[in-house]
Amino acid sequence: MTVSSDTTAEISLGWSIQDWIDFHKSSSSQASLRLLESLLDSQNVAPVDNAWISLISKENLLHQFQILKSRENKETLPLYGVPIAVKDNIDVRGLPTTAACPSFAYEPSKDSKVVELLRNAGAIIVGKTNLDQFATGLVGTRSPYGKTPCAFSKEHVSGGSSAGSASVVARGIVPIALGTDTAGSGRVPAALNNLIGLKPTKGVFSCQGVVPACKSLDCVSIFALNLSDAERCFRIMCQPDPDNDEYSRPYVSNPLKKFSSNVTIAIPKNIPWYGETKNPVLFSNAVENLSRTGANVIEIDFEPLLELARCLYEGTWVAERYQAIQSFLDSKPPKESLDPTVISIIEGAKKYSAVDCFSFEYKRQGILQKVRRLLESVDVLCVPTCPLNPTMQQVADEPVLVNSRQGTWTNFVNLADLAALAVPAGFRDDGLPNGITLIGKKFTDYALLELANRYFQNIFPNGSRTYGTFTSSSVKPANDQLVGPDYDPSTSIKLAVVGAHLKGLPLHWQLEKVNATYLCTTKTSKAYQLFALPKNGPVLKPGLRRVQDSNGSQIELEVYSVPKELFGAFISMVPEPLGIGSVELESGEWIKSFICEESGYKAKGTVDITKYGGFRAYFEMLKKKESQKKKLFDTVLIANRGEIAVRIIKTLKKLGIRSVAVYSDPDKYSQHVTDADVSVPLHGTTAAQTYLDMNKIIDAAKQTNAQAIIPGYGFLSENADFSDACTSAGITFVGPSGDIIRGLGLKHSARQIAQKAGVPLVPGSLLITSVEEAKKVAAELEYPVMVKSTAGGGGIGLQKVDSEEDIEHIFETVKHQGETFFGDAGVFLERFIENARHVEVQLMGDGFGKAIALGERDCSLQRRNQKVIEETPAPNLPEKTRLALRKAAESLGSLLNYKCAGTVEFIYDEKKDEFYFLEVNTRLQVEHPITEMVTGLDLVEWMIRIAANDAPDFDSTKVEVNGVSMEARLYAENPLKNFRPSPGLLVDVKFPDWARVDTWVKKGTNISPEYDPTLAKIIVHGKDRDDAISKLNQALEETKVYGCITNIDYLKSIITSDFFAKAKVSTNILNSYQYEPTAIEITLPGAHTSIQDYPGRVGYWRIGVPPSGPMDAYSFRLANRIVGNDYRTPAIEVTLTGPSIVFHCETVIAITGGTALCTLDGQEIPQHKPVEVKRGSTLSIGKLTSGCRAYLGIRGGIDVPKYLGSYSTFTLGNVGGYNGRVLKLGDVLFLPSNEENKSVECLPQNIPQSLIPQISETKEWRIGVTCGPHGSPDFFKPESIEEFFSEKWKVHYNSNRFGVRLIGPKPKWARSNGGEGGMHPSNTHDYVYSLGAINFTGDEPVIITCDGPSLGGFVCQAVVPEAELWKVGQVKPGDSIQFVPLSYESSRSLKESQDVAIKSLDGTKLRRLDSVSILPSFETPILAQMEKVNELSPKVVYRQAGDRYVLVEYGDNEMNFNISYRIECLISLVKKNKTIGIVEMSQGVRSVLIEFDGYKVTQKELLKVLVAYETEIQFDENWKITSNIIRLPMAFEDSKTLACVQRYQETIRSSAPWLPNNVDFIANVNGISRNEVYDMLYSARFMVLGLGDVFLGSPCAVPLDPRHRFLGSKYNPSRTYTERGAVGIGGMYMCIYAANSPGGYQLVGRTIPIWDKLCLAASSEVPWLMNPFDQVEFYPVSEEDLDKMTEDCDNGVYKVNIEKSVFDHQEYLRWINANKDSITAFQEGQLGERAEEFAKLIQNANSELKESVTVKPDEEEDFPEGAEIVYSEYSGRFWKSIASVGDVIEAGQGLLIIEAMKAEMIISAPKSGKIIKICHGNGDMVDSGDIVAVIETLA
C-alpha cells in the first residue's frame, strides 16, 4: 500500500498492527512519516477529545521516527512504525505523567519498562490517554480532563479506569493501547467498547514507571482489536524486571499452549444482574457457543471468589492506594484538581492499622485455600466482564454503587493470582456491546488466547466478528491467528525419544546440540514393545517395535521439538540399526520417533524390556544391579599419562573407584591430572625421572592408599620388576605377574614359550650382545632381517635392516632405545617376512588357567613399525584361520595361567594363509577401543575385575562381534619431514562428537617433546567395512588440531586410498606408499612473512585487539581475486625480502604488491598474474626493489584456524595466522582439502594493467588524508596545519606493522599543555584512535597501522582514509610523503571505486587520487556540536576521524564518571537499536570512537542519528551500573619488572627522572615515601574507563579515591619491551600490560596475565578479563607465588577473584562528600609549586633527550661474511653433537642430534665448510627455527 502526499489519517483508521507494518514496508520513509504526522494532526483538532490527556509534538514524532529509521533491523521489528497510546499513569519520556491529576504531574526522565519494550519493538508513542484519577474506578468519569464516553454512545460510559485507552483503540486511531488493571480496569472498558482486553498473569509485565494503584496487585494491560495484536504485544512485554519491580517474575519456560478440546469451564451458579436484562442474553449466548467448542461447561458457586473480591475495597488493600500518593496528599494539592470520589476512597485507608493489614491478609489466605479447592477440577472460569452498560447519568447519581457493581466479576482476579482475557460477546439490541471474561490459572495466558479463538469461530462464524466501532467490517482471519509460546510447529519437528536420549542419559547431549526443546513426558499407544539391543559400543540402545494392540503395551517417552534445519544433523547421529520413523502417542497423535530395523530386535543378545514400561526404568535397574556387584578396589593408581590415563579414569569413575593420577612437571595441567580424584606429582621432566621411576610410583600409591596400580601401556606396563615390586608392597598390579611378564616381555624367551605351545615361529636368534655376533646371525638368517629390542614395544626398539652395511648403526640404535625407554638393552634378530600382515588377538586370562580370545585386530598399517590404522575384524581372513589364531592365543594364555589383558601378535602371510608367532604384549593395547566397539565390552573394567579376582565366567561368556570398527592414531608429527615430532601449544582442537575419540588434548594443551607423540585415537563403528571407512574418513575431515603439525593429512590420504579400500595391506606397504601432501613448506622464511586475511579482525578495536590483516589491503585483495578466491581467504604477506617455498601439491598462485624477482624452479615468473605450480616446485620471492610488501595468494587459501573471527597474524599478541607468529624455516602449511575448501569463488583470471597499484619508483608518495579528529584552532595553530600539508615527511627507519613513524617539522601547538591529559600539548585523556590516524606522540607523528594500539593519550591531526592506506603499507624507511586533504565524500568515492574495480576486474572503474579529489585547503574536523544542557548533559563535539570513524567527545578536558556513564548509555542505545551501519563503539575516558560502514550509512546520516540519540539519554547523578570487582595478586617491584626498567636504561635512555627506579620517581615528584606508593597500590580501587591501553584488553583505569591520583609522567621515549602482567602508573591512570609490548607507564610491579588467549579458564567466555566500569584491586604476593599463579593462569586453572557487584554513583558521591576536606587538601597540594617543579623536571628531561639520546644496541655476534646459519627445523632436546667446532664437514653430513618424542633427529649441514659454532649443549631445549650451528663456507 502506498500513500500520496494528501493522504490523511482516515485511511489508517481501524488498521491492525500488521496493516501498519505492511504499509511501512511498502512505502518510502517520507510516506511513512507523512501518515504518522497526519494521524497526529487529526487528534490535535477541536473539539478536544477527552480520550487524550496529552499528545506528542511534531518534533517528538520526528525524533522517534529518526531513531526507528536508524535501526538496522527495523523491518523485522514486531511493531515496526506502529502508533500506540499509553494510559497516563504509565511513564513515557517526553510526555508528562499526570495520573489524571494536574497537580500531580511530573516529567519522567525515562520510559516505563513496558513502554521501553514497545519502543524497542518499533512502536511510535503518539500520546497519553485519560483515566479515572489515580486509576481508581471502573467508569471512566473521574477525571478533571473530562469524561471519556463509550465509543458507541456519548451518553454511556467507556468504562474505567482505562477509559481513554479503550476509546482510542475502539475508534481505530491506534491498534494498541496500554491500560492498567488492578480490579478490572483492563477488562471492563474492553467489554463496553467491543475490544480484546488482556490482563496478564500478575508480575509478567513490569510495573516499573507505573504510578501505583495497589502495587501488589497492579498489572499493565493491553487493549487490542484482535487476538493476534494482543498476543504480539504480550510476547514483547512479557519480560522479567526484578531489578526495578518488586513483584516482577519470569514467565514459565514451557507454558500451556492450549486447553484440551473438552476443557472444563465453570460459570457462576448465581449471577446478579442488578436489573439488567440485555446483558444476560449476551452471556447466555456466549456460554452456549463455548459449549459448542467441545468444552465441558459446569456451574459452580463463586462465593469464595466473590468473598475475595469484597476484600479489595472493604479491606486494607485500599491502603496501598494511599501509600502511593501519600507524600503528594501531604503537600496539600489544590482541591479542584482532585476527584472527590477518588480521594474519599483513597483516604478511607486512614482508618486501618497495621494489625488490620495482617488480619485481612490472613483472611485472604484463608479464602484462597477455599478457592484452590474450588478450582481443582476446573480449567477456566467464564464470567460476564461487567453486568451493566451504565450511562453517564447513572454513574453521576450513584458513583460508588455503579462502580462497585461493575467490579463484581473482576475484583477477585488479581487477589487470586489468575490470568484473564476479556473478549466481545456481541451486541445488544440497543447497539451497545458487552463481553465475557475467560479466567485461567497463572501462566495460562497463551491458552486463554487460543480458547478465545475457538470461541470466536463458533459465536462469530464465517469471519463475522467485528472490531471496535467498525461494525461494517470483519476481523481478517489472519488477525486472530496466534503464534503461541516459543515452540513453533511450523519451524520444528516433534520427536519422541525412548532410550539413551532421555533426560540425564548418555545421548541427551545430542538433543541439546540441535537445540531441541522439551515439550512433555507421555506414553505410546498400547501397541508397542521395547527391546534393549546388543551393546556394541559404550551406549546401550533401545528398539521400539509396533505390534498388534493385544500384544503391545504403553511405553514411556519424552517429546521434544527439533528445529527443522537441524533435524538432518540429528538424524546423522542416529546409529544403526535405528532409524527415524513415526510413533503413535496415547493421545492418538503420530509424531517422529526412533524405529528399529527387524535385524535389531531379532539380533542375538536383544532383551525384551517391555515389562519395565520404559527405557529409564530398565536403565535404573541396570545401574542398581551394577552397584550391587562385588566391590573391587577403593582406590586405583594409574601409572601412566595421556589418553590411556584419561580413558582408564573413565572406567574407574563408572565403577565408583577412586582414581589416582601421577604426573611429571610438563604434565602438571594435563587432562588425566584434572580428571582424577587425586593427583600426585612425580617431580621430574623426563620419562626416566617420572613415569619410569618405580619407587616414585609405588610411593605415590602408598601415599594415597591405593590398593591397585594399573599401568596402561608403555612406561612400566611390561616391566616385570615393577609388577614384583607392587606385589612386594602389598599393592595389586593390574596385569600379569612379574614372572609371566619376564618370560613373555623379553621377546627371545617369548619365542621359546610359544614354541612349547606349538605356535609357528619366524626363524630368529637368541639375545645378541655384540655387533659382530649380529652380523654373523643376520648373514645366517639372510637379509632383510628385523633387529628387535627384547623389551621394546609400541613400535620403538625394532628396525628393519636390508644389508650388512647398516647392521652396526641400527644394532646400536635399537640397543640405545631399549635401554633408554625400557631399561633393557637386550637385542635379538628375526628374519623379515615380506608383505606380511600383522594380526593380533585380544586375550583375557583369569590367572587360574582360563583364557578367552575377544576377537582379533588387523594392525598391518605401520610406519617405522608404529601402528597407524587398526581395524577389527581383520579383513580378508578365512574363518578357519581366524578361529585358529584365537585358539592359539587361548592355548598360550591357559598354559601360562595368564592374568588380565594381553595381546598375542602374529605375522600373517596372506598369500600362503599361514601365521607365525610374533610376540605377546602383556598389557592393554593402544588399539583396544576397536575391540570394545564391536563387542560392547569394557576391557579396562575386565582388567580391574580380574585383578580383584572377580573375573567373568569365561565358560559362559558369549563374545559376539558386531560390525566393523576402525581406529586412526593422530600423532604430533610432521609427515613432510619424515614424521619428525612436532611439539607445541595447541591453539584450537575440534573432534567429531559423534565418533569415539580417546584423547588427552584440548585447546591449550602443551605437547611436550618428552613423551610419545600420540594426541588422540579416532574410533568409528560401522555396519560393515565400507561403512566404517566412510565414517572414519568423515571423522578425520571433522578433526581439526592447530598449534602443532599432525599426521591428519597423511591419515586422510591412506583412508581414501585404493589399497586401503581393497584391504591390500601389509606391514611394509606404507614404506613404499607415495604420500602426496596438500601442503607447502617454508625453506627460507624471508624478513617478515606472515599469514593475513582481509578485512582482518573486525569488531575488537574497543578491546585493544588490532585488526591486523594486510598492510596493503588493495594488493592483498588483488592476489586473492586473481587466483579466484573469496576476498576473505587467508594469504601470505611478504615484507622487504621474500621467502622460498616448496609446493608439495599442484595449485595456482599470484604475487602482487611491491616488485621483486620471483622465480619458480629458477625460472622468473610474472607478478599480478595467475601462475600454475606443479607438485615439488620451489617458489622464491626475492628482495623487493620497489615498495615494501608483496602478497602471495594461493588458490583455496591456507588451512589455519580463525582467532576472534580472523585468520590474520598479530605477532605481538601471539595470535592468529600460523601459531601467532611470522613464518619460520621448516614450517609446513597445509592447504584446505577439496572436501573442506569453501574459499574458491571463481576461476583464476588475469587483471588489466590499470588495476596494478602504482608504487612509487622515486620514493616520493602523495597520500590523501581527512582532517581531524583534532585540528585548529583548539589543538594546532593554523600555520601548523598548513605546514603539515605543505612539507614532505620522511619515513623513519623504526616503522613497521605497529606504526609508520615520520620525520618532519615540529608542530606548532595552540595550547601549552594537555591539561588533565598530560604535561605536553599533544597529551589528552585516553581515547580510541582511528586506524590510519596520524598520531602525535609528543612532537613526533606516527601513522597508526593495522597492528597498532587502539587506546592512547595523544592527539591525531589527520587520518589516512581506507582507500589510501595501501600506500602506507608500501612506504619504506627513507621514502618521503606529501599529505593532501580529502573530504569524506572523496575518500568514500575512492574506496567504493576500489571495491567495484577489484570485484569486476574492470580497470575503468578504479578512481585514483587526483587533483579533483583534493580539497583546496584543510577543513575543520568538527562535524557538529551540541551545547551543554546541564552537568549530566554536557557539550558534545562530533569530530571527523577518517572516512569510517566519528569521534564523539563529551564535556571539557577532564575525567568525569558521569561522562563515562553517558558514553556507556550511548553504546547501550546503539546496541539495543542495532543501529544501521554502526560497526563498533570504542570507549575512551571522555569520548567514544564510532566505526561505521559507509555502504550502509553516510557520515551525515550517522550524525543525524547520533544527535537524536543524545536526547534519548536521560539519567540523574544517582545512576548505577553493573561492575565486577576484580581482586588481583601483585608482586611489588619483582625482578622481571625491574629488568624491564634496567633494559630500558641500558638500551634506550641511560638517564631520566624516572631512572633508575620508577617507584622512587613517583614518590619524589609527589613528595611522599616509597612506602606510601606501596600503600596506595594495595589500598586503591581502580575504575576501568577503557580497554586497549597498549593492547589486548589492557585497562585504562583511574583510582576511585582522588587522593590516590598521583602526579606522574610516562616514559619518553617509550620502552620497547614491557613484561606481560606488569602494572604501570601514568599520572592518575593505572594500566596492566596484557602482552609483552612497548609501553610508557611507570612500572611498579607485576600481576597475573589478564588476557586469556585461548579462553582456557572455566569462567572465560572471552579472552579479556575486564570491561569498562569494572573495579580493580591488588593484594600483595611474593614473586614466587605470582609465578605459580601465572603458570596456573596460562593453563586455565587459576580462578580470578571476581565479585559481581553494582557501582552506585550516588553512594560514591556520598563518600566523596564525607571526605571532601582531605580530598581538597590533597588536590591543592598537587598544584602550585609542586606542579611547577614537576613540569620543569619533565621539561628539562625532554630537553636533555633532544640534545643527546644514548642508545645502546643489542649486542650482535659477528660471523665471517658468507657464513651459513644452520636452523633447527623442529623442537626437542639437544642430545649430542656428532661433529665439533673446527671440523670440516661436507654438505649433508650430520652435525648434531635432537631427541624429541622418543625419536632421534639428525640436523645435517646445508653446505660444506668448517664448523665455527655449536650453539647448544647436551640437555638444552631447542625450538623450531632456533640457530643451532654456524658454518664458515670454504672456497
From Swiss-Prot:
Residues 751-948 form the ATP-grasp domain. The modification Phosphoserine is found at S803. One of its GO terms (cellular component) is cytoplasm. SMART domains: AHS1 (SM00796), AHS2 (SM00797), Biotin_carb_C (SM00878). It catalyses: urea + hydrogencarbonate + ATP = urea-1-carboxylate + ADP + phosphate + H(+); urea-1-carboxylate + H2O + 3 H(+) = 2 NH4(+) + 2 CO2. ATP binds at G122, A123, I124, I125, V126, G127, K128, T129, K747, E830, N865. Hydrolysis of urea to ammonia and CO(2). This is Urea amidolyase.
